[in-house]
Swiss-Prot record:
Reactions accelerated catalytically: (2S)-2-hydroxy-3-oxobutyl phosphate + 5-amino-6-(D-ribitylamino)uracil = 6,7-dimethyl-8-(1-D-ribityl)lumazine + phosphate + 2 H2O + H(+)
Function of the molecule: Catalyzes the formation of 6,7-dimethyl-8-ribityllumazine by condensation of 5-amino-6-(D-ribitylamino)uracil with 3,4-dihydroxy-2-butanone 4-phosphate. This is the penultimate step in the biosynthesis of riboflavin.
Annotated active site: H89
Organism: Helicobacter acinonychis (strain Sheeba)
Protein known as: 6,7-dimethyl-8-ribityllumazine synthase
Binding site for 5-amino-6-(D-ribitylamino)uracil: F23, A57, Y58, E59, A81, I82, I83, F114
GO cellular component assignments: cytosol; riboflavin synthase complex
Matching InterPro entries: LS, LS/RS, LS/RS_sf
Length: 156
């Protein structure tokens, strides 16, 4: 039996984009910091890293599609924060953003990591953006790095 897995180390020549929702920026700014920290710690070249800001989580799939279609990037880390409110808006936005991101990744067969928080309240979002529950932005970039390595290994 052969075990095939990715490594948590960049070569330094990977072109990466981080797409970030500005809505709930108090949370997404921290996710962005975590993702950039992970990128640097694991050998990323900051000259090859681009940050792309979008208005909200609903717009993430469209801009992800444009980035992957451009073929300028080896992978994309998608970050956002959708916090439940008093209306069904949360359910619609979180479902469509999630489906759109997954469908776009499969459409282009390119590494994409999902760092979009979907929380019931602001406290849960804060916990996942760098306090008690770690930083999901860091984790999303870590996932992307490993996925890039694994895809490269499987490519041959």
């Amino acid at each position: 039996m052969q075990l095939i897995e990715g490594k948590l180390q960049l070569q330094g020549n990977e072109r990466i984009a981080i797409v970030i929702s500005r809505f709930n920026h108090i949370i997404t700014d921290r996710l962005q910091e975590g993702a950039i920290d992970c990128f640097k710690r694991h050998g990323g070249n900051e000259k090859l890293l681009n940050l792309v800001l979008v208005p909200g989580a609903y717009e993430l799939p469209l801009i992800l599609d444009k980035l992957l279609e451009s073929k300028k990037y080896d992978g994309v880390c998608v970050l956002g924060a959708i916090i439940r409110g008093g209306t069904p808006h949360f359910d619609y936005v979180s479902a469509e953003a999630t489906k759109g991101i997954a469908n776009t990744m499969l459409k282009y067969s390119m590494p994409v990591s999902f760092g979009v928080l979907t929380t019931d309240n602001i406290e849960q979002a804060i916990e996942r953006a760098g306090s008690k529950a770690g930083n999901r932005g860091f984790e999303a970039m870590s996932t992307l790095i490993e996925l890039l390595s694994l895809c490269q290994t499987l490519k041959g």
